[in-house]
Amino acid sequence: MKTKIFKNISILLSFGLIVKVLGLFHRIIITRVLTLDGLSLYTKMMPIATLFSVIASFSLGPTITQMVAKNITKRPYSNRDLMIKGFKIATITASIVSIIHLITNYFITHYLLQTDELFKPFIYFIPLYYLQSYTGIFKGYFHGHNKMNTYAIGQLIEQVIRIILIYIFITPMLKINLEDGIIACVISLSIGELIQNIFLFLCVLKTTKINNKTNIKADNKAIITTSINLTTSRLSNAICNFLEPIVFTFSFLKTGMDKVVADEIYGIIYGYVLPLIFITGFITTAIETAILPELVTHHKNNNHAAFKNIMNKALLLSFIPASITTIIFYSYSKEMLMLFYNTENGAFYLKLLAIPSFLSYFDGVFISALIAINEEKKLAKINLLTNFLYLFLIFILVQIPKINVMGLIISLIIYLTTSPIIYFFICKKRINYHLPKEGYILLLIYIISICSIAFFKNIIITIIIYFLLLLWLVINKTHSHHSLSS
């Protein structure tokens, strides 16, 4: 079992690294091609498009993962029927969302975003709602069967297509005007998604037997109920992302500042800073994706020890990218921005957000654990609470003249640190989960490393201290195992 989990994590990490590098390369080119003006407009659309996409996809991906994972052991219904009904539900929800999008397009771009240039580009997101919904179903199916490499290859193909399209499609369109260039960016997302869907569909037909012996039809009610619970949680985040630029711009303009400045600041934070902070997020995503089917199985079999053991190892693995990434970006904020985006815009914000983002790297493990024990409703409530708090803080703090833009940064810091702490205490209460002593030692190592940066002002000394402490932890743990064995 352990071998399977780490094999899946290794597969996802290997492909995830390649996909992330390609995705980063794609983002760097797009950022430089669009310039700050184009990037500000492009990032302004994304939260609303994401909101519509979340509703359209209806969380069918994780729902299918759960149901297929359970179906492997008990086979309560046909996998073939499960897939067919999933696609039908996805088509219906995507169609409803598309109609709503068309009806509200002018209102959103003119009144909410106050940017008429986005009227045409925003319409081109509609095909993406269908395609992302179908991709989610394929992803859920392959992950439920622990076929992690198939979906990973699909992602790899998608990124390659997007990069090719920059040169043969986006760049020529940008020469016409900025609006057509942004439209080309949106269309390229749909083309990449379409190619990935075709690949995954062929893999289902060729390598996967979805016609199992079970003739019991999948229950629409079971699919919809699970999807509603998961969607409620994701919807809360999507609505928050949707309202965030609106609330920020409104509060910022109340102080008498210019709208162009508001768009630029938002573009810097969400176009440069946050993508960099979570640049190694593919590692934690790979971990949480790989452990979910196993956690579901262990919970169903009442194997609590194995359940907690997987959580411990997943948190330990998440610590590595969390600590290294945040320390590097805290120490070299200007250098990192110059390296990736050829600009120092946002260096101050990157330095402020780097360390507080550390805890958010553990979100995924706790969320996977709570989903596995059927606590989707509680997850939705927590997300709703933290998102409301986040928007409320932006609304209040940004309007205070002495705080202004820093109100968004303060709100982000509180938001990034609150959720993982709440998730931890729920896991502690619900499954009697306790962080192992190694976890506390690692936290201490991280704190000492941060303090040493502040004291010595030298990252080299910090790295030496960091790895010496880690070495001490490994030696100490090995010695403890030998002592127990003897």
Q: What is each model feature region?
A:
Residues I84-Y111, K308-L359, L391-F392:
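Alpha-helical transmembrane segments of multi-pass membrane transport and lipid-handling proteins
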Residues M1-L22, Y77, D81-I84, K217-N237, ...:
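N-terminal membrane topogenesis motif
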Residues L131-G154, I355-L385:
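Membrane-interface junctions at transmembrane-helix termini in multi-pass inner-membrane proteins
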